């Protein structure tokens, strides 16, 4: 039985004495080494590789749809031995090194030892931070071949996405930097301005040249300036803030810990953490992703990255931060919880980063963010650097910058709200549900490899479509908000590794997640907000790689986004189908439910510095009054988030009446 239940390298029969209850497995511990025992998940599918809670396709399938790329030598059954040896997963590693099994007991454990001065570290907490700061100097730790393979992979490892073939073409993307005394951009990873140790880690990650956002953000942050940055999805925003923050940390060393909180001898385990850098992001998946990147670039340094988020065992997270926490990646809710428990102090913060800031406010995190920034012991805006990164910056976010940033530089890379030319966009007309199914099966049957991400509007549709594809012998799984955290993580893991190369998702995967090797994004259900479309298709064509995005357009259901979708295609120099031009023209004549300037930040100047273009006194997050950017912008004419008098408004594209900021379609969920 234990052999039958060995799922993706997870030995569910090999736990501790008596096979007692298993511990929660945090996402950043997926595939990591450390600690005793190799327990698998407590619950999960036992009959196949489908989504959690559903049986996958039979393991005996040898031919997929029309002998497509899904068919033949891939074994999508979740049962069997080491996942690295399964068909469709990563190739076996060399040098007699095998991908380790999941280890829920390794959270914060291990035997690496050490600390700032040699006290009780271990496990992943020391995997990135085994250097020292001694006598005012940064002393990198020794090379660890195993950790390097874990963090950086190998050149042919499909689970690690490296620089794409079109990366150099990013030089053609326009960049606008506004503010006084904007520093000159950098064009190479070199010293100065970057620290030599960081450059060595960047080389291990196989990054050759900075992306446009990195070319500007590195000298801006290294020069001590605050930054508000808009950049295309997948353009390297994470490196844009991690590189300068870590480089400065390697040069200046740790901040002193208050004497009242030091352990014996001044170092070692301490009850309260005093991070010097704080990165806030909206979702558990995104903070885990940023944490993984921080581990890469902090490798062999004195800097200890940590991650905290809701839905995970708080005891494990407390033990983690007790071992030292220099760079903290967190979701707002869990961070507030740990602050209330007296386990994290923000008094040493030098750098505050708000990533996906617009989505954090969309999800209702503004009270927590304001409490963290303004209501705790964080240094005030004059005594810290604040960086805001996102793919869009609508008016209410730019207004928030007045409270959180000082004398900042506004950086717009490319046309924010536009899409990458690395993505080939196709729009297909459908008249009813059967058309969608037929087109989808045709697309999947001609798929040439890589991962396919399919977006639907509702949780029910995600499960139904995933089940249908499995019944067609296609290896699919699904992810949405009704899944448990463990189920979502397992589905994402199987998708990333190619065990289930088709993922049906609601909006939970639409923002921020960096899933390597996604070659095709299909908008099975078009969203009602064009910005959501931009973020969805941004899951492919990342880091300079090419990708395909296909959208199913129904004249009856999707005419509200026809004009904006047409503009997106024109901006990216894509083919324009005649039916889309007809739909946009009919909509402009017929008025209807316009979005008051084109959704969140589009048409209202979401990629422009509002300090240059002015704006009314109203608008804003709660609507009402003045109209936003030079009139007609975000919240124009009393619209906004819930402002009086706007409603859905009339007047078609960009029409008067403001447009409700909410969710006209009704079915969309943040999950």
Curated annotation (Swiss-Prot):
GO terms for molecular function: ATP binding; ATP hydrolysis activity; eukaryotic initiation factor 4G binding; G-quadruplex DNA binding; G-quadruplex RNA binding; mRNA binding; RNA helicase activity; RNA strand annealing activity. Keywords: ATP-binding, Cytoplasm, Helicase, Hydrolase, Initiation factor, Nucleotide-binding, Protein biosynthesis, RNA-binding. Residues 59-75 have a biased composition (Polar residues). Its main location: cytoplasm. Residues 1-141, 588-612 are annotated as: Disordered. It is found in: Cytoplasm. ATP binds at residues 231-238. Residues 422-584 form the Helicase C-terminal domain. Residues 94-105 have a biased composition (Low complexity). A motif (DEAD box) lies at residues 355-358. GO terms for biological process: cytoplasmic translational initiation; negative regulation of cytoplasmic translational initiation in response to stress; positive regulation of formation of translation preinitiation complex; regulatory ncRNA-mediated gene silencing; spliceosomal complex disassembly. CDD domains: SF2_C_DEAD (cd18787). One of its GO terms (cellular component) is spliceosomal complex. A motif (Q motif) lies at residues 187-215. The keyword Coiled coil does not apply. SUPFAM superfamilies: P-loop containing nucleoside triphosphate hydrolases. Residues 218-411 form the Helicase ATP-binding domain. SMART domains: DEXDc (SM00487), HELICc (SM00490). Residues 107-130, 589-612 have a biased composition (Gly residues). It catalyses: ATP + H2O = ADP + phosphate + H(+). PROSITE patterns: DEAD_ATP_HELICASE, HELICASE_ATP_BIND_1, HELICASE_CTER, Q_MOTIF. Its EC number is 3.6.4.13. Belongs to the DEAD box helicase family. DDX3/DED1 subfamily. The Q motif is unique to and characteristic of the DEAD box family of RNA helicases and controls ATP binding and hydrolysis. ATP-binding RNA helicase involved in translation initiation. Remodels RNA in response to ADP and ATP concentrations by facilitating disruption, but also formation of RNA duplexes. This is ATP-dependent RNA helicase DED1. The lineage of its organism: Eukaryota, Fungi, Dikarya, Ascomycota, Pezizomycotina.
């Amino acid at each position: 039985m234990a052999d039958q239940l060995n799922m993706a390298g997870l030995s569910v029969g090999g736990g501790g004495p008596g096979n007692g209850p298993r511990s929660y497995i945090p996402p950043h511990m997926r595939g990591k080494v450390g600690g005793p025992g190799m327990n698998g998940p407590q619950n999960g599918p036992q009959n196949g590789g489908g989504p959690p809670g559903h049986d996958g396709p039979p393991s005996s399938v040898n031919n997929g749809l029309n002998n497509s790329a899904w068919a033949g030598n891939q074994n999508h059954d979740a049962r069997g031995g080491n996942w690295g040896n399964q068909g469709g997963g990563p190739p076996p590693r060399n040098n007699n090194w095998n991908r380790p099994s999941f280890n829920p007991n390794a959270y914060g454990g291990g035997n690496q030892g050490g600390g700032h001065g040699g006290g009780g570290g271990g496990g992943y907490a020391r995997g990135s931070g085994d250097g020292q700061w001694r006598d005012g100097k940064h002393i990198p730790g020794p090379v660890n071949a195993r950790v390097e393979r874990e963090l950086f992979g190998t050149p042919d490892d499909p689970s690690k996405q490296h620089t794409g073939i079109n990366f150099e073409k990013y030089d053609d993307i326009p960049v606008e930097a506004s503010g006084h005394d904007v520093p000159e951009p950098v064009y190479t990873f070199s010293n100065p301005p970057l620290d030599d140790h960081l450059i060595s880690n960047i080389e291990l990650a196989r990054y050759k040249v900075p992306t446009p956002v990195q070319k500007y953000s590195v000298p801006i942050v290294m020069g001590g300036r605050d930054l508000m940055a808009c950049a295309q999805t997948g353009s390297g925003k994470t490196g844009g803030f991690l590189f300068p923050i870590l480089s400065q940390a390697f040069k200046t060393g740790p901040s002193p810990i208050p004497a009242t909180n030091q352990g014996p001898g001044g170092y070692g385990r301490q009850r309260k953490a005093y991070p010097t850098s704080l990165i806030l992001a909206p979702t558990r998946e995104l903070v885990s992703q940023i944490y993984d990147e921080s581990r890469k670039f902090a490798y062999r340094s004195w800097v200890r990255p940590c991650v905290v988020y809701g839905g995970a065992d708080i005891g494990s997270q407390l033990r983690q931060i007790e071992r030292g926490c220099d760079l903290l990646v967190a979701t707002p809710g869990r961070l507030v919880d740990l602050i209330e428990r007296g386990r994290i102090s923000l008094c040493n913060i030098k750098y505050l980063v708000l990533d996906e800031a617009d989505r954090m406010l969309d999800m209702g995190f503004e009270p927590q963010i304001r409490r963290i920034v303004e209501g705790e012991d964080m240094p005030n805006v004059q005594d810290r650097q604040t960086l805001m990164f996102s793919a869009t910056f609508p008016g209410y976010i730019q207004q928030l910058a007045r409270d959180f940033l000082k004398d900042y530089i506004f950086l717009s890379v490319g046309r924010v709200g536009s899409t990458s030319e690395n993505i080939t966009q196709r729009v297909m007309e459908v008249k009813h549900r059967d058309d969608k199914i037929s087109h989808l099966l045709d697309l999947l049957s001609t798929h040439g490899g890589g991962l396919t991400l399919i977006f639907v509007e509702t949780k029910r549709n995600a499960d139904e479509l995933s089940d249908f594809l499995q019944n067609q012998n296609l290896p699919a799984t699904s992810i949405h908000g009704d899944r448990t955290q463990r189920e979502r993580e397992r589905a994402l893991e199987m998708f990333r590794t190619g065990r289930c190369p088709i993922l049906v998702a609601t909006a939970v995967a639409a923002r921020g997640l960096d899933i390597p090797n996604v070659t095709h994004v299909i908008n099975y259900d078009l969203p009602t907000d064009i910005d959501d479309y931009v973020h969805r298709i941004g899951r492919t064509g990342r880091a300079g790689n090419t990708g395909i995005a296909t959208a199913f357009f129904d004249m009856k259901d999707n005419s509200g986004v026809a004009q904006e979708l047409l503009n997106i295609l024109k901006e990216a120099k894509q083919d324009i189908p005649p039916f889309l031009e007809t739909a946009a023209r009919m909509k402009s004549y017929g008025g209807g439910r316009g979005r008051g300037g084109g959704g969140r930040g589009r048409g209202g100047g979401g990629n422009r510095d509002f300090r240059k273009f002015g704006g009314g006194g109203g608008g804003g997050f709660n609507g009402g009054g003045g109209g936003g950017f030079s009139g007609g912008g975000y919240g124009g004419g009393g619209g906004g988030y819930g402002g009086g008098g706007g409603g859905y408004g009339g007047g078609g594209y960009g029409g008067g009446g403001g447009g409700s900021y909410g969710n006209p379609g009704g079915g969309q969920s943040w999950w």
